[in-house]
Amino acid sequence: MSVDVFFLILPNMMMLDIVGPAETLQLAGDHFKIHYISPEASVQCSTGMMIGDLKPLPEKLPEGSLLVLPGVTNSLVDFDTEEALVTLKWLKGWREEIKRQAFNIVCICSGALLAARAGLLDGIQCTTHHDILDRLRALAPAALVKEDRIFIEDKGVCTCAGIMAGIDLALHLVHRFCSPQEAMKVAREMVVYFPRAGEDAQMSPWLRFRHHHHPVIHRAQDIIAISPEKNWNIEELAALIHVSSRHLSRLFRQHLGISVREFHEQMRLAIAQQYIQSGMGVEKASLVAGFSSARQMRRAKMRAEG
């Protein structure tokens, strides 16, 4: 079942704030169904390009959908325009649904200012571009504004720091609504240099060790990621990729700073954690992930945490 995603388009919105997240979600295939809505049938964006065939603001949003608020060029948000006033009135009508997390709000860059003016960020941990953090605090004094964050998700509200951070946040949404594997596939297709997570390292190791562009390492990582429960050894992996085991080991150390075994172990930990979070017992989850026992998994976790 696909997730409905509504991009709210207003005049002078940053094209990258729209197309960056939209293309990221679109590359996840049928998992997301994208809609473009606006108080106007067509608007001019930051580059001067006109966007037409925009649908009117809906009276109802589907349960579990995403409402995306892109940022405005140069963060010059004018709340007194006719479009802004209509939009704010519409957004305020969703406050109760947002509180019970009937759907999710996604703010790209200065889109957080629009959400703040509508009263949607009270009591919410949030962030925005570093140049307008003080303005966000002024508009939403009851919000918990955080600095030095790429993105934050709190109580169904997602906010992010700036233009390219919208892609990081969109990859996080693919990770959350689809799977780590799907997020990894999309990141690779976009050739995204991707060490960035939001406020934690929940995407690790699926994406944390994908910040390189070496095809040999990617092939080895893909093989391990597909079947992390298998007892892969470096000689077997090297043979499948048609390189020597010494060369493969050297590449992992050089580009990732870890060994093939360490990467494999962290993949198993990630799989086990997913099963545990879904309700599976620790012992069974450890076995399904490829560990010989829960005790071995705990030891691996201690090694990974240093």
Where on the chain are the PLM-derived regions?
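Extended, subdomain-level signal for the structured scaffold at the beginning of enzyme domains
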Residues: M1-I105, L114-R117, H175, M184, ...
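Predominant activation on well-ordered alpha-helical scaffold segments within soluble catalytic domains
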Residues: V19-A22, R137, I167-L171
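Structural detector of well-ordered beta-strand residues that form the stable sheet scaffold
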Residues: I105-V106, T127, K146, C158
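Conserved anion/nucleotide-ligand pocket segment
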Residues: R149, E153-E189
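A conserved active-site-flanking secondary-structure segment within enzyme catalytic domains
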Residues: L121-R149
